[in-house]
A protein has these predicted regions:
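Non-cysteine beta-strand/loop elements that form the S-adenosyl-L-methionine
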Residues: 28-34, 64-66, 106, 209, ...
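Conserved beta-strand edge residues that scaffold enzyme active sites
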Residues: 36-37, 70, 110-111, 214, ...
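Histidine-acidic metal/acid-base catalytic patches
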Residues: 1-6, 11-13, 54-57, 74-78, ...
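Acidic/aromatic-lined carbohydrate-recognition and catalytic surfaces
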Residues: 65-99, 103-122, 127, 134-145
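Glycine-rich, proline-tolerant flexible connector loops at the mouths of alpha/beta enzymes
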Residues: 34-50, 219
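Extended, charge-rich helix/loop segments that form flexible
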Residues: 111-188
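Catalytic domains of carbohydrate-active enzymes, especially glycoside hydrolases
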Residues: 11-36, 55-59, 95-104
Length: 365
């Protein structure tokens, strides 16, 4: 089984799920990690990386995938100061290469990272899940930020892309992004990638961009990685084997017109990292994240996994957002990153993969 199963871990003191817990989940070999206290634009120092490496290696895991080294806003906006932050990013790549890192997941979304309107939405069976209610996403970004910050303040839990430091300067950020059109954002992404590709080759590290979540413009901000055409443009814009994708089935399938399995088959050789997430759609455009089992949503998890299997996928894969189960809830669990549903998702994914392996063996006779 060539694919490598990973688990996103937020670090000691920052994640209720311990490395000891993860060690007990069959099939997990890789910890997907980051230095979550580092702000975009800062250099990840050797001693900081070493501390996390020692923790991960003590449990026999590899640390091949980083999610994420965030891109500074000056790079996305295209300010004259961007070159300084690009140099810092290059140094991060060099430092990470000393620890065997092979893939850096990142995104190029303006201001916000992922966006949801309810972090613990009841789904009817006693569990909760991340939920997106389209009517709540108006032009008033402050109410959305206030909602996320209420969890940060009450439970002392920060969320990637919604850090208090960023939320404190939202008005300033929106003003800075005001002149940035979608085409300008594409230009700035290309500039960034062309600048770092030589370093990626030097260090043998693939840059793997995550699709925009959700895959449409919000709060008047442009989004780039939203559909198959955008992915085609991205990969041809910088046609380099180190310019890759973190293909997120859930982010893309928030728009039911996106056929994730087709995208996998077309670009499998440029997918370095796969996120497997299931989505349940509502007729009004709302969506709720669902269990990984195929019939629990409309992503087509079996067809997505079949596409990876048929392509001989040898990259890294992890269960993406799961539901919060049993005693998990606000204060005891990161929204979407509970222990139980992701562990269940892994076993489902591995079961599908094992069956596909068996079917291939039977065909060979």
């Amino acid at each position: 089984m060539p694919m490598k199963m990973g688990w996103r871990w937020y670090g000691e003191g920052n994640d209720p799920v311990s490395l000891s817990d993860i060690k007990q989940i069959p099939g997990v070999t890789s910890i997907v990690w980051a230095l979550h206290d580092k702000m975009p634009g800062e250099i990840w120092e050797i001693d900081e990386i070493q501390k996390v490496a020692d923790q991960i290696h003590a449990y026999g895991f590899d640390m091949d995938v980083v999610e994420s080294v965030n891109v500074h806003d000056d790079i996305k906006i295209g300010l004259p100061t961007r070159d300084k932050y690009i140099e810092n990013y290059k140094q991060c790549i060099r430092n990470l290469s000393k620890f065997g890192v092979k893939v850096i997941c990142y995104n190029f979304m303006p201001v916000f990272d992922w966006t949801r309107t309810d972090l613990f939405h009841p789904v009817g069976d006693g569990s909760t899940a991340l939920f997106y209610e389209k009517s709540k996403i108006k032009d008033d970004y402050k109410s959305m930020a206030d909602y996320i910050m209420s969890f940060t303040e009450k439970y002392n839990m920060t969320f990637p892309g919604w850090e208090p430091e960023r939320m404190a300067k939202l008005d300033e950020l929106f003003k800075a992004y005001a002149p940035v059109t979608k085409e300008k954002l594409w230009e700035n992404l290309k500039y960034f990638l062309e600048a770092i590709m030589p370093t990626c080759h030097e260090c043998d590290i693939k840059m793997a961009i995550h699709q925009d979540d959700p895959p449409w413009d919000i709060f008047g901000l442009p989004r780039l990685l939203t559909d198959a055409d955008a992915i085609d443009r991205f990969l041809s814009m910088v046609d380099d084997p180190y310019n890759c994708l973190t293909l997120c089935s859930g982010s893309l399938n928030a728009n039911p017109n996106n056929n994730v399995a087709e995208i996998v088959r077309k670009h499998c050789d440029r997918i370095a990292f796969a996120h497997i997430r299931n989505i349940h759609h509502f007729d009004n455009g709302d969506f709720c994240e669902a269990a990984h089992r195929d019939c629990c949503g409309e992503t087509g998890i079996i067809e997505v996994l079949r596409a990876y299997h048929d392509c001989g996928f040898e990259g890294y894969i992890r269960p993406d957002h799961g539901r919060q189960l049993w005693e998990e809830g606000p204060g005891s669990c990161r929204p979407g990153y509970g222990k139980y549903d992701r562990a269940l998702g892994i076993q489902y994914m591995l079961g599908v993969w094992d069956l596909l392996d068996r079917l291939d063996e039977e065909k060979k006779g």
